[in-house]
Amino acid sequence: MGGGDVPGESSSDPQALLPLTPVALNVLLALADGERHGYGIMLEVRERTGGRVRLGPGTLYGAIKRLKEGGVIEESGERPDPGEAPGDERRRYYRLTGFGGGVLAAEVERLDGLVRAARRKGACPAPKPSPGGA
């Protein structure tokens, strides 16, 4: 059962969630390197995509709600940076669950397979060599 942010019922198989929506994938990628609050997720997505993807609050928080309900992300009970400015106490921080990390890895593997198939068919260019000759 894929095609949404999370499955309709609880599942321990990350594959059951695939394919993720672009919004869900962007949220999970934003959380892959640590906890973030909602606005931080929006900023990370905008920066990572060069401004091509901008998540509005309604879209973002709808996805967060569904991802939480599916056990993919969770709300953190503590602030990751106790030195943050006053007023940040109200911010809710989110993080990937262990299951959510598996979902993200499964989706990246699925997308990688699609890209490899497209390259075999000549539908997209081969990757550019990385600097340094690797």
Write out the residue ranges for each language-model feature.
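Exposed loop/turn and edge beta-strand positions of beta-sandwich/beta-sheet ligand-binding modules
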Residues: 90
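N-terminal helix-turn-helix DNA-binding core of bacterial DNA-binding proteins
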Residues: 14-59
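Beta-hairpin "wing" of winged helix-turn-helix
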Residues: 70-87, 95
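Amphipathic alpha-helical dimerization/coiled-coil segments
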Residues: 2-8, 99-134
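Basic amphipathic alpha-helical segments that dock to polyanions
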Residues: 60-70
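N-terminal intrinsically disordered/low-complexity leader segments
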Residues: 1-16, 81
